[in-house]
């Protein structure tokens, strides 16, 4: 039996797996055979790793494990298009994964940390603080978990968005190892253009991502177009002011030849006026940028509310005068706490209420 400290095979990229097997005397053929079993055949137990050499299988059983995520709680939206999962990790931590079904395609929103250190005031995860980084296997494991759900109904996954719990660029190494697994041609073989990473604006991470050969999409959570307004909503803005952030974004766009998506959560009376839109338009004018406008998902602990539809339209109209395109992101799963961190917070509140009180 492998120990609790044995290597989780899902934490390894294909080169790392090759290095492990090479130390045992097995070559690239055996590496790729095992890799295909994990990511193409979706093996979940060692018994399902049939076809491997008996000696290799024995070494795997003794020295590695197949880490699995377990469903702790799940909710389904009333329209049937959103499936939110609270997944339990080996140490008891829980993370959120959201499966969203659109016409002819499925998208999954995955987490990169248990909790988050960025502290965005309107985000339920930001109110929790950071517990720990996820390992590459825990990040990829969310995709594998969702793939099993989709396969049962004959569906396939098309898009992955790293917009769940946590800041991906705060867990850079593990997140990028997971991305490398997702795009590996012999594994899940996802196209990089179907993967989007969302960041609050970790400037060193944006610049590093620009310098590396991972042509995924980048989305930046902006929410304010002046330093003061942004820092009031996104405390990380105090560490990386807008001039530094926008310089990094321009560097990324020019280096990678890719459009950057900017996320703007519209909060009634806070950042949804024509004046706010003009300031944002001036900030982004001339960039290859697209704004995703997101009416706020109400969150316990934050008293802000979503903008009215007419305010959303007026905001977009102003952006258009600066030739800045925008899209209103459809809110999904409002009835099942599908906003980041909301399901975890709800389940934990219910658990606390159900605990017996001491005499």
From Swiss-Prot:
Binding site for [4Fe-4S] cluster: 116, 120, 123
The name this protein goes by in its record: Dual-specificity RNA methyltransferase RlmN 1
Catalysis performed (reactions): adenosine(2503) in 23S rRNA + 2 reduced [2Fe-2S]-[ferredoxin] + 2 S-adenosyl-L-methionine = 2-methyladenosine(2503) in 23S rRNA + 5'-deoxyadenosine + L-methionine + 2 oxidized [2Fe-2S]-[ferredoxin] + S-adenosyl-L-homocysteine; adenosine(37) in tRNA + 2 reduced [2Fe-2S]-[ferredoxin] + 2 S-adenosyl-L-methionine = 2-methyladenosine(37) in tRNA + 5'-deoxyadenosine + L-methionine + 2 oxidized [2Fe-2S]-[ferredoxin] + S-adenosyl-L-homocysteine
Functional description taken from the UniProt entry: Specifically methylates position 2 of adenine 2503 in 23S rRNA and position 2 of adenine 37 in tRNAs. m2A2503 modification seems to play a crucial role in the proofreading step occurring at the peptidyl transferase center and thus would serve to optimize ribosomal fidelity.
Gene Ontology CC entries for this record: cytoplasm
Gene that produces this protein: rlmN1
SUPFAM superfamilies documented for this protein: Radical SAM enzymes
Keyword list, A-Z: 4Fe-4S, Cytoplasm, Disulfide bond, Iron, Iron-sulfur, Metal-binding, Methyltransferase, rRNA processing, S-adenosyl-L-methionine, Transferase, tRNA processing
């Amino acid at each position: 039996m492998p120990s609790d400290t044995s290597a989780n095979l899902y934490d390894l990229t294909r080169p790392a797996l090759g290095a492990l097997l090479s130390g045992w005397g097995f070559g690239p053929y055996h590496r790729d055979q095992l890799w295909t079993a994990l990511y193409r055949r979706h093996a979940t137990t060692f018994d399902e790793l049939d076809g491997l050499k008996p000696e290799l299988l024995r070494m795997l059983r003794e020295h590695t494990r197949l880490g699995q995520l377990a469903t702790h709680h799940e909710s389904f939206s009333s329209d049937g298009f959103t499936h939110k999962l609270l997944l339990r990790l080996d140490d008891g931590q829980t993370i959120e994964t959201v499966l969203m079904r659109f016409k002819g395609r499925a998208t999954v929103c995955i987490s990169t940390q248990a909790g988050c250190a960025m502290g965005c005031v309107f985000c339920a995860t930001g109110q929790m603080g950071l517990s720990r980084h996820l390992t590459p296997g825990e990040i990829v494991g969310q995709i594998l978990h969702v793939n099993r759900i989709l396969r049962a109904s004959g569906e396939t996954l098309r898009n992955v968005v790293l917009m769940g719990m946590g800041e991906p660029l705060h867990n850079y190494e593990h997140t990028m190892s997971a991305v490398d697994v997702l795009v590996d041609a012999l594994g899940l073989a996802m196209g990089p253009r179907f993967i989007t990473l969302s960041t609050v604006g970790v400037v060193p991470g944006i610049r590093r991502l620009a310098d590396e050969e991972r042509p995924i999409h980048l989305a930046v959570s902006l929410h304010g177009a002046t330093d003061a307004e942004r820092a009031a909503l996104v405390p990380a803005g105090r560490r990386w002011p807008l001039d530094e952030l926008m310089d990094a974004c321009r560097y990324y766009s020019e280096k990678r030849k890719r459009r950057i998506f900017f996320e703007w959560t519209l909060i009634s009376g806070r950042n949804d006026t024509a004046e706010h839109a003009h300031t944002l338009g001036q900030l982004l004018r001339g960039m290859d940028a697209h704004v995703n406008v997101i009416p706020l998902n109400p969150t316990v602990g934050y008293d802000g509310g979503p903008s009215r539809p007419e305010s959303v339209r007026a905001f977009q109209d102003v952006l258009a005068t600066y030739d800045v395109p925008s899209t209103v992101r459809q809110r999904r799963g409002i009835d099942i706490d599908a906003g980041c961190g909301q399901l975890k917070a709800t389940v934990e509140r219910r658990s606390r209420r159900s605990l017996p009180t001491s005499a």
